[in-house]
Amino acid sequence: MRPRWLAALTVLTTVAAGIAGCQPQPSPQTASSQQESQSTAARQSTPLDAMQDAKRAGDLQLAWSLSKPVLLAYPEDPKIITEVAQLAFENGLKHESADLLVEAVRANDHADFAYVQRAVIGLIAVGRMFDAIDLLNAALTRHPQQHPSRRMLFGFLRGAGNNNAAVSHARRLILDRQIEFEFLLALGDAGEHKLETDSMQQMVARFPADQRPLMAVAKTLVDQTEYAAAESMLQSIVKQHPEYLPAQMLLGRVLVERGSWAALETWSQELSGDYESDWSYWLVLGDWAYERAEVAMAVRAYAESIQRNPDVLQGWTKLNVALNELSAIDAASYEGLGWDNSVQDWIEDRVRRLATLEQLREQFNPQRPDAVIQIVEIASTLRELGRLWEAEAWAAIGMTLPNGSKDRLAETRASILRLLRKDTPWQSLAKQPVLNLGLSNLPAPSFLKHVDRDAAHSHVAKVQNDEAFAVSATPKLSDVAGNVGLTFFGRTRDDLDKPGIPLYATLGCGGGTLDYDLDGWPDLMLMAAGGTPPQLDSQPNALFRNIGGRFIDMTQTSDAVDTGFGQGVAVGDINEDGFPDVLLLNYGVNRVLANQGDGTFRDISDELFTDRKSQWSTSGAIADLDLDGLADMMVVNYCDGFDAVTQLCEQPQTGLSRSCAPTHFPAAADVVYKSNPQGKLVDVTSKWQSTPSMLGRGLGIVVGALDAADGTDVLVANDMTYNHFYDFTATDPPQFSESASLRGLAGDARGNPQGSMGIAVADFDQDQKVDLYVTNFEQEYNTYYQQRSNHTWIDTTAKRNLTQQSLPLVGFGSQAIDFDNDGQQELIVTNGHIDFPPPDTKLDYYQPLQIFRLRSANQFESVALPEQDSYGASLHAGRALWTLDFDRDGQRDVVITHQTEPVALLKNETGTRHHWIAVQLRGTRDSRDAIGSVIQIRHGDQQQTAALTAGDGYLCSNERASWFGLADGSLPIELQVSWPDGSQQTHSLDQYDCHWLIVQAQSATRLPKSRSGEGD
């Protein structure tokens, strides 16, 4: 739905340009005609008559020369001033004409909107947009009820990127009962909307003396993460207009995103005006303080920001994370706040409701048949946020819609009206204690001059000095699937190469690695679909046995057949017998295949689950979540029910039936299963309080020791809803509570939920803390979460140079992998759209494989793959991606599934002589798989950390081992294992280029190439 203000701005700019381009030019006058005109003028009794006669005679120059006495004679007559303005315009004096039209408005005391509108058009015609804004402000000062002027001013301010000012006028229009959807949708989005850049560029082309309209272009560049270009443009704006706070505030934000801290400090010293009243100033100040590890100061700054604008989601999310970190690292300061113990619960509730509101507003369309239901949800959410006038306005305009029953909406409106009084403020403080936080016990934030940023104040780890940084070798990958017997094409439909793919068929099919026969060679389980969920009519999945680097289909022989609508695979020892079992995730009924140890599997689903349901499951993990020594299970679910199988949604722009957005269907809750001593899996989701306040639409999962605390954590990547992070607390009853917003993992840097799918896990910056990389949908950069403290993360994607490359792509599976074993992890991402985009877009269904490597200690670069790499040089509709070392040469390989082509096995042929070790763990006191362990190694002056995980991202399971590239290597290798139960053990390894088995409380064992030791 295109906002009316945007359309009006475009039309107004075009109309003004047309007027300017079609102005009549003064005609050359002959001497006789000039004499005749002058003679006629001399006979007139007034200057006005003389001017008008000259104009009628076609002598525009003479008429203009006679206009000054007219203006002196009629200084308060708006009609005559307008006539002179028209004369100036016809003489090509466009700026003079605009000035006179403004004078006519003043002469009319701004009372008649027709004069105001005419003057605005004149000013726009010469590019003086901000003079038009000043004029409209003046008109509203004199006549606050001049609603057409306020509407026009709202549009100009919104178009120029000054959302703070635009929102104030939208609120006034709503309070004056001038309720329109575009005003309601403008509220509370902190400027996160599409801007009309062409019109703004036309303004500057017409009037280069005012660069402020380019704010719209700069804002668009920021939205596209083109921070360098945005900074350059904003610098030119503030150089010309240092007092223009919207540009200054956006510049501050850009400097934060770029990590230009010295420039930010200079920026702060050059600010003038009432900048401290702007919420975004305090947000920038909070980011600066947080980067410097001044956490208490950051909390104060973020709190100051939300007090100035409590509707900005990112202010609340950042306050939430900073407050959580303060409680962990500075208990005295946290307790000294004097805040209620439940303050973080209040903040999380505010975050949840604001996030819900943003999603509801984004999905809203008054043309939808369920628009009234949408409005009920929006109005109810606003009521809970204390924004009662806004809530009532939504309900009121909803009552005017032609379709849908209004009974529930009428009840909702009545409940809101009962709370409203004439003196009710826009943001009610009733039942909103979080809006009254006392800040006096927090340090007053202020920018200080800190040019020397020592290590104590920097959370950007240095692997080594940039000057000495050795860039990893360019990976060489070859698809050898067909050469080694891996021929399989698991797909969701047969027509995935044609437009109109329904949502249920867009996710693809995944797979996983397991050594089911314990011969040391990793085997593969691959999923398939193609039928109709939840029926058992799909193509069967496949189990490929790896014999010395070649694969043989053992599906039928091993009794591993399932014909459900396959999605993902989870691998783990669910019954603790030493053999890896398999969880098959389906859109329908999930299945657990128990490894019998004799080369066959048995479906134990009915005897294992106490309650088994049909659901849309995507990914899962098998791991001991409560540290009782028994493997548990977590199942990630997507949308609830089966409507997605039959429903398509018509696209308003094209009228074509396409895949519905996931948010068109209800979200499904993830399920946590606990193993009991009787060998059953019991659903403990409710008992462990594991249902989050806002359900997600889960696609990816990783389970492991993701933070520094003992125990196992879970990250779930959700599509178009906030990600979830769970950690177990051994209370009575136990709690497996969700805390992604507290940890900084719920959304991106601005607090927005994204279309999250794949997850890569590694200590990329080698600070001995786990970092995370989450893939997202197009125009949502893949997010790099750097672990900042022992239990919080921060989005540093822009600082890592990882935003631009992923914006135009749809990222699915991703993994961290050290291709050349130099000790530094790279990133690999498979991309592909969910459907064929409309023909008038620049998007592609088939998209490139991407690999990123560190080009310096802190920044990544995209790797251009060699032309001889036929797979990397071509485009694909990739889906799941996971790792293994299928030929056991010490270089990890990659498996990728696709929508329109068979599975690919990318053999890692990167030329290197670097050394390596692979470490496998076996628990004795802990669960046998030992998920949640952390391995640290030291060799020479190098130190590396790896968390042993399950789930492994999008629809997949990696080979269960931890790889360490050693570069040139040095012996001995000091290895320390931190087990899930908190115990530690150390070993000194005397060989590399081999697999090591570490059994809990036993000596390390070097494994021969023929066996992995999984059954030992």
Task: Please annotate each region the language model reported.
Residues 48-49, 79-83, 113-118, 148-155, ...:
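Alpha-solenoid helical repeat scaffolds
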Residues 56, 90-91, 125-126, 159-160, ...:
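Register position in tetratricopeptide repeats
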Residues 75, 109-110, 144, 175-178, ...:
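Short coil turns that delineate tetratricopeptide repeat
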Residues 373-374, 486-510, 537, 558-570, ...:
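Repeat-based blade/solenoid architectures
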Residues 376-378, 394, 689, 801-804, ...:
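Gly/Ser/Thr/Pro-enriched helix-cap/hinge segments flanking short amphipathic alpha-helices
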Residues 477, 521-528, 577-586, 633-637, ...:
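Hydrophobic beta-strand segments that make up the repeating blades of beta-propeller
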Residues 508-518, 566-580, 594, 616-627, ...:
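Beta-propeller blade termini
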